[in-house]
């Protein structure tokens, strides 16, 4: 799954939810 780095929220296929998404 993609997890927002430094965020608790998970990326739902959208990178706009965070600056950088990393493979979790």
From Swiss-Prot:
Locations listed in the record: Secreted
Annotated GO MF terms: toxin activity
GO CC list: extracellular region
Tissues and organs where the protein is expressed, per its UniProt entry: Expressed by the venom gland.
Keyword terms, alphabetized: Disulfide bond, Neurotoxin, Secreted, Toxin
Record note on modification: Contains 5 disulfide bonds.
Disulphide-bridged cysteine pairs: 4-18
Transmembrane in keyword set: no
Free-text function comment from the UniProt entry: Potent toxin that may paralyze and/or kill insect pests such as H.virescens (lepidoptera), S.exigua (beet armyworm) and M.sexta (tobacco hornworm).
Family: Belongs to the neurotoxin 02 (plectoxin) family. 02 (plectoxin) subfamily.
Annotated protein name in UniProt: U1-plectoxin-Pt1e
Organism (species): Plectreurys tristis (Spider)
């Amino acid at each position: 799954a993609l997890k927002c780095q430094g965020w608790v929220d998970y990326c739902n296929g959208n990178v706009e939810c965070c600056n950088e998404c990393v493979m979790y």
